[in-house]
């Protein structure tokens, strides 16, 4: 079974040895006291015993992992993939497809950019608000990758998204973390059981001895940039990708372990990185970060955003999002994150947008327009309307759309206030929007 779910069921066969297991076959694997059907994506025989990289069918890709042979149930049949069509059949299929395409050469020119009709482009379809920027919900995995932006922080190699996770465990400070995805660390590190990543420089090592020797000599105790925000809880540093290429590339390599579609680890020059840290007696420990393009043609205020796994589910994600909008307010701009968001990223943004909109509407207590909400929050009108529709507070009344507050919204507002979650204090932000000339925005300036 492929990730897009289009491949037909395979051929069931009983086997006696794991030597008969091949890539793309499916077998039953022990996982958390239950058996799950898993697809073999890769086989590693460089070290004994052999290991198999598996994707659990109908489960999230971040659960993919390396397993040993003892977890594979050979008592059940293995599904082998069906043989692909012969080369002659493929040629006929391609020829037929080319003929069909040539019959309507003007089809692609009938529509506007990105497939939108050139007519009625000023009309907003409130039933089809697309906060993810993906046109078709039925789009396949391969088509989705092809449609990703080729600028910003999107991966530009479609095969890269499907690569096998190459690191087993990383040790960062006092935390041991299991990566989720592939990241292009040096190949000599991929056979190590643990990779050591320095808490402050993000430099990586294949052995504990190398790491400890490096740590004794290194004096850096915070991200190598300007501290632009500090309160009793967190600090924020601004780092220019051009001025701190090595550190920013190390950051991108680390974040790629936990982000699937996003990848930028060589060309960091066009980006600014805003890193959130927690302080202790040792220094500033990285909690999460977001990056943004120095000049975004699409008006994005965030390119990549990540809270490190050891700090997730603690409220740091909302602080990162809130801080990105505080920067947009300082710039007197509206902004939105680069699309598509990861599943966790979309959940975090939806929660932030909902909380922000509910708080504003309840506390404002006067009539207010969508444009005024956008100006006060720096959220785009599309994100505001999407959030209002999700909250079910958008209604069509007497020829216009209105937002109304119901009891559920008021109850949610009261619960928000009772939580007393931490927020960003705009008065503690010491920052002016950086200005770059055309020559400064060019690569290798």
From Swiss-Prot:
Motif placement: ESA1-RPD3 motif: 245-266
Residue ranges constituting the MYST-type HAT domain according to the UniProt record: 162-433
Post-translational note: Autoacetylation at Lys-262 is required for proper function.
Function: Catalytic component of the NuA4 histone acetyltransferase (HAT), a multiprotein complex involved in epigenetic transcriptional activation of selected genes principally by acetylation of nucleosomal histones H4, H3, H2B, H2A and H2A variant H2A.Z. Acetylates histone H4 to form H4K5ac, H4K8ac, H4K12ac and H4K16ac, histone H3 to form H3K14ac, histone H2B to form H2BK16ac, histone H2A to form H2AK4ac and H2AK7ac, and histone variant H2A.Z to form H2A.ZK14ac. Acetylation of histones gives a specific tag for epigenetic transcription initiation and elongation.
InterPro entries: Acyl_CoA_acyltransferase, Chromo-like_dom_sf, Chromo/chromo_shadow_dom, HAT_MYST-type, MYST_HAT, Tudor-knot, WH-like_DNA-bd_sf, Zf-MYST
ZnF locations on chain (C2HC MYST-type): 195-220
Name of a matching Pfam family: MOZ_SAS
Record note on quaternary structure: Component of the NuA4 histone acetyltransferase complex composed of at least ACT1, ARP4, EAF3, EAF5, EAF6, EAF7, EPL1, ESA1, SWC4, TRA1, VID21, YAF9 and YNG2. The complex interacts with histones H4 (HHF1 and HHF2), H3 (HHT1 and HHT2) and H2A (HTA1 and HTA2).
One term under GO cellular component: chromatin
Domain of life: Eukaryota
Effect ascribed to mutating residue 256 to A: Strongly reduces HAT activity
Gene that this polypeptide is encoded by: ESA1
Domain comment (free text): The ESA1-RPD3 motif is common to ESA1 and RPD3 and is required for ESA1 histone acetyl-transferase (HAT) activity and RPD3 histone deacetylase (HDAC) activity.
Identification of the protein by name: Histone acetyltransferase ESA1
Mutagenesis or variant effect for residue 304 to A: Reduces HAT activity
Effect of residue 338 to Q: Strongly reduces HAT activity at pH 9.2. Nearly abolishes HAT activity at pH 8.0, but is not lethal (in vivo). Lethal
Enzyme Commission numbers on file: 2.3.1.48, 2.3.1.-
Record region (Disordered): 88-114
UniProt-listed SMART domains: CHROMO (SM00298)
Organism of derivation: Saccharomyces cerevisiae (strain ATCC 204508 / S288c) (Baker's yeast)
Effect listed in the UniProt record for changing residue 259 to A: Strongly reduces HAT activity
Keywords: Acetylation, Activator, Chromatin regulator, DNA damage, DNA repair, Phosphoprotein, Transcription, Transcription regulation, Transferase
Modified residues (N6-acetyllysine): 262
Catalytic-site annotation from UniProt: 338
Effect listed in the UniProt record for changing residue 252 to A: Strongly reduces HAT activity
